[in-house]
């Protein structure tokens, strides 16, 4: 029996990835001296939180770039003002069935809080687990949730959107449901 459903944030709760890429590029570009930062350069740092991503992209002066990122990210969030249709209703239905709801994201605490506030979801989750600057820590966060709630892996499901989400789930023995919620044009 499922007792805990955990969600990823970027690409699962909302279409925030394009905005994240633009905000990161805008924040780090003034601090990169050798080359322009490409979208690919940024994508290669995914799995780390924004502090780790920016440190890797900028090196020296990363603190200033990180401060800039938070300002830019909050300003740009108008590009993604709400979660995917049906997400908040799904969470409410699960809660009515007494299922625990968690958020496990690679984002750092501050950018996660900005997004949840923008989506008016800052009180939706029983627990929020964020990323770290050194490595993808989702498997570790899953283990912590299982321990916190004294659950077995088969009592938890994670809803994510990347191959790395599947890998992290398999590492811990929990099921991963893959979300493909991106809006596409009719053409």
Q: PLM features: what roles do these ranges have?
A:
Residues 16, 160-161:
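Acidic di-acidic motifs
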Residues 2-9, 13-88:
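N-terminal helical cap/lid subdomain that shapes the substrate entry/recognition surface
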Residues 75-103, 109, 113, 139:
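Short, acidic loop-to-helix structural element flanking the phosphoryl-transfer center
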């Amino acid at each position: 029996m499922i007792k805990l459903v955990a969600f990823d944030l970027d690409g699962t709760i909302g279409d925030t990835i394009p905005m994240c890429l633009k905000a990161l590029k805008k924040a780090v570009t003034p601090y990169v001296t050798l080359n322009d930062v490409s979208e690919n350069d940024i994508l290669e740092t995914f799995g780390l939180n924004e502090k780790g991503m920016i440190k890797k992209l900028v090196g020296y002066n990363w603190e200033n770039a990180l401060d800039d990122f938070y300002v830019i990210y909050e300003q740009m969030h108008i590009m993604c003002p709400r979660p995917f249709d049906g997400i908040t209703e799904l969470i409410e239905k699960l809660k009515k069935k007494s299922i625990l709801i968690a958020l496990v994201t690679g984002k750092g605490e501050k950018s996660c809080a900005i997004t949840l506030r923008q989506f008016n979801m800052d009180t939706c989750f029983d627990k929020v687990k964020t990323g770290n600057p050194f490595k993808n820590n989702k498997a570790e966060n899953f283990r912590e949730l299982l321990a916190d709630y004294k659950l077995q892996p088969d009592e938890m499901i994670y809803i994510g959107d990347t191959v790395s989400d599947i890998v992290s789930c398999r590492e811990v023995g929990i099921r991963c449901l893959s979300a493909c919620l991106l809006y596409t044009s009719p053409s």
